[in-house]
Amino acid sequence: MKFNVSSTTLFAQLQSVSRVIASKNNKLPILDSILFDLQGQTLTLSASDEETTIRTSMEVENAEGAGKVAFDAKLLLGTLREFPEQPLTFTIDEQNFGLNITSANGTYSFIGANGNEFPEMPEIAGDNHFEIAESTLLNAINKTLFCAADDELRQVMNGLFFDLTPEQFTLVATDAHRLVRYTNATAHTEAPASFILPKKPALLLKNVLDKNDEQVNVVFGQKNARFTFGTTTIVCRLIDGRYPNYNGVIPQNNQNKVIIDRQMLINACKRVAVFAHTGTSLLKLTLSANQLNISAQDISFYTSAEETLSCSYEGAPMSIGFKAPFLIELLNNIDSNEVMLELADPARAGLILPMENAENENLLMLLMPLLLQD
């Protein structure tokens, strides 16, 4: 087999598919490789870690022959990473799976493996499906993925919960301390359906999706889901189990409401958090008439800080504690200039809502409080 290809174009495609390859793979050595499948003038690249498989296609020039050969991903990426933009010639010996890469100034050779030993992409057993714009799915993942748990005992919390109805698409993530619920009315299924997407394929989607309005076709069953967009297909194994009733933990009818500039709040929290106890990172928020006081202290080192910010506040005077990194990270993942904090009492979860949502979108963030000692 033989073909010509742009060095930078091929490198970009190899980078995309290589993200799925496991850092340690003891079961199938061929999964350290990227599969090259040449058919006509189309080169298809595939990579897998057994649970997630990604496949993408690109056009090449002057192709001769056809077949499948797998090549070590580190060797490929290490070689192509240093090339400036230039045409490369790939010559593959189908008998011993040897590869010669010819550039303007040199030749690079190594041995691959029989592509027929590479695992096939799993078929999806199920007819649940929906379509969603790439930009919408990317935004949904960006707004939720950071909040997914890393919990060996509760595997269902380690992914993103796709909850679909005939009216809307909802994406949820929680680590039991924080919860994010993203809803969009532009995607839906014919009947209620749901699945839990693991973090690794979610991160892969985050890295390969574009900010455009091209549609992503999603098909899912009991065990696997398939995402198809442009020339790329991702198939992944789903997390088995029942996701917690996320709507049941969202407090309703919160009487105390704060409206405040988001960036001003972030900056103040960052400054005051420097003085918080290193073990708890506790920030105390004290609310009174149109004022928010943020304070922290570490009595072990005799340090303390406080700032008072102007805000719009409806409710009774109250104080509540939050873990500084969690509060700051939630605020950083909101786009609106202003946010609303809805609070009930110091022992119940607080809600953080953007004052402005994009069309057809709704975002809700929940943060569990920390106990105040005084």
What are these language model-derived features?
Residues 1-374:
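Structural preference for solvent-exposed beta-strand-turn elements
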